Amino acid sequence: MSESNSIAPAPAPAPVADENEALARSVILIVDDNAQNVELLQAYLEALPCRIVTAFDGIQAMKYIDDPDQAKPDLILLDVMMPKMSGFEVCQKIKEDPATRSIPIMMVTALNELGDIERGVEAGTDDFLTKPVNKLELITRVKSLLRVRHLKRELDRTMAYIEDIENRAQKNEPGGPVG
């Protein structure tokens, strides 16, 4: 094949970052109406290189999430029993919106009945942790949810890359595979 007919490969997606690098880019939103609970969760998560942002009710949380000038959180730690808007309502709103539905939500609450857990799952929560919170359990679950979040992002980027290559190959455009 002559040089003028060769097709240059499309640039590959960026390599997968290591876990600490991914954690350092992560934003965790803590939503709880009790300032002491917020401070405790912040103190527990200090060991992680994440950026922590807070909201003290569901309406404040939704304003942060919907603000185009703010980075979307990579994880939300959400209390259930709050004034103005319950955690169940916040969770449901987030999961109904295509722009935010992939954000993992961990409900962190004093509610511990099976019906409460079921209601959380029905609202769309990804995890459910009862208070009082164990620091090691919290950190382990947070790392796990963030790992899944970042792997999904990598998968989405790779799938977009593959789709781009397939589209270029079908149109015989530069950047598609040589064949």
Regions found by a protein language model. Name each.
Residues M82:
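Receiver (REC) domain active-site loop signature in two-component systems and cognate sites
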Residues D79, T109:
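Active-site residues of response regulator receiver
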Residues V27, A35-I59:
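Two-component/phosphorelay signaling modules centered on CheY-like receiver
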